[in-house]
Amino acid sequence: MGIKKMFKKKDPTEGEIRDELTQIGVTTKSDNKTRQEKFGAFKNYAQDRQNAKPGFQPVNPYANVNAGNGNGNPYAQQEAGGDGDGEAMGGNNSSPYDKTTNPYGSRSERANNPYGNGNVGASSRGERAGGRNTQTNPYGGARASGRASGSKPNPYGGVQNDGALADDTESINTAVTGYADPYGNETARASRQSTRRPRAYDEESLDLNAIPSHQAYTPSKPIKRTQMRDDETLDLNDLPEEEDLNLDVDELPEQEQVDSEDDEVEAIKQDIRFIKQESVGSTRNTLRMAQEADASATNTLGMMGSQSERLYNAESNLLLADTQSKIADQKVKDLKRYNRSIFVPAYGNPFNKKSRLRQQEMQIKADKAQEKYLRDTNRKEMYASEQRIKQGISQNATSSDVHQKYRSERDLEAAQRYQFENDSEDDEMEKELANNLDQIGLYSKKLQSSAKTMGNEVDSQNKRLGQIEEDADRLDINVHMNSARLNNIR
């Protein structure tokens, strides 16, 4: 056995196979000639973002507020078994916000209202471990229980409240207000309606979607001003003179007309300034969002460039695998011929040896030319994709300083048509407004160009993916056929 192993032919190594293929002119994969990635930073950024641990990502602390792990609302209504904070020795540490009831609830909920009518027996804060000292509500009605043992009498309980014997309207109004009149029947008879506004009124009067109006938008009318002379005395009982709303501006005195016109001019100036400031703020926000969109588009283009590089690597590997598959096919045919019977000669016809050699050379040339053509085609597609993405990324959304100076002067001249008593601040706002609008327009053009570049790149990569799919299917079939031929060799 040892001698047999000694003379057994060893399997060739990968380096020996590669050297042999290189000698016969077959292209092999070289680890030293790796193509430098120009969009590798985008690929690394995407991989780091995908492989980021959940602990490093921002966590919302309010995500599980309603979970059943005890992190619920501490002020929610709970059905505690104690009497609130009135028990000093009972050991019940219930929340002071428990058993909260709606004071505006229905009539069935009036028993839970601590400030309801006098029929409610509230637990006292003076309750101890020995017994219950019930203390009534000092602001309750005349029918509040003041005769319990140890209880303090109501100082207003002597007056009998006959309002409880009135109709249901008074009792409902008393329940809505949340407390009875402590001064007895006289006040109850005087006012039978609640002074509290219903909830529907508050909901109708409060509009959360209403836009707050600015004082500059409030139209100012000419106001008739009365100036007090030095010899006049101040009479506190004197009624102010009524304003005549039908009075025309032309009928006012000259000084008052001048004052009203000055007020109107000042209000118009304030309106212009306020609207201009709002416009500048809007353009700033729009420019910021345009810059964010441009950064997102640049990142997307970079990711597509990295994807194009990986597609090129896949195409090169498939081309190399196809070449190796053809060589394997030829080797399988030779092995099948050598494995024939000893009675059938393995060598061919000696009379057509030259023609066979010439045919093999032509086949090698054709395979090499086809391989070179496919490699050049893949390289051209990769170069075109790289140039498209570089052009989309390197587009500049800003202009030169000379162009900016020329544009600012032209914008100031154009703004003179609708400016009114402008100062340096107005000129600066006009410059910023015009500059922001120009930048927004340039960013819009760049985004449009980036979108077109993305569309063209996506179409090109889709075609390349289709070609890769076809090559992979053909390679799979060839490998499967070679495996079947090897299995059939006996």
Curated annotation (Swiss-Prot):
Sequence ranges of Basic and acidic residues compositional bias: 9-21, 30-40
Domain of life, per lineage: Eukaryota
Ranges of compositional bias, category Low complexity: 58-80, 140-151
Acidic residues biased stretches: 232-244
Compositionally biased spans, kind Polar residues: 94-105, 392-401
Alphabetized SMART domains for the sequence: t_SNARE
Transmembrane segments annotated in the record for this chain: none
GO MF: SNAP receptor activity; syntaxin binding
Region (Disordered) location: 1-244, 389-410
InterPro entries: T_SNARE_dom
Keywords: Coiled coil, Protein transport, Repeat, Transport
Residue span, t-SNARE coiled-coil homology domain: 273-335, 427-489
GO CC annotation terms, alphabetical: plasma membrane; SNARE complex
GO process annotations (BP): exocytosis; protein transport; vesicle fusion
Similarity comment: family membership: Belongs to the SNAP-25 family.
PANTHER family per UniProt: SYNAPTOSOMAL ASSOCIATED PROTEIN (PTHR19305), SYNAPTOSOMAL-ASSOCIATED PROTEIN 29 (PTHR19305:SF9)
Protein name per its UniProtKB record: Protein transport protein SEC9
Source species: Debaryomyces hansenii (strain ATCC 36239 / CBS 767 / BCRC 21394 / JCM 1990 / NBRC 0083 / IGC 2968) (Yeast)
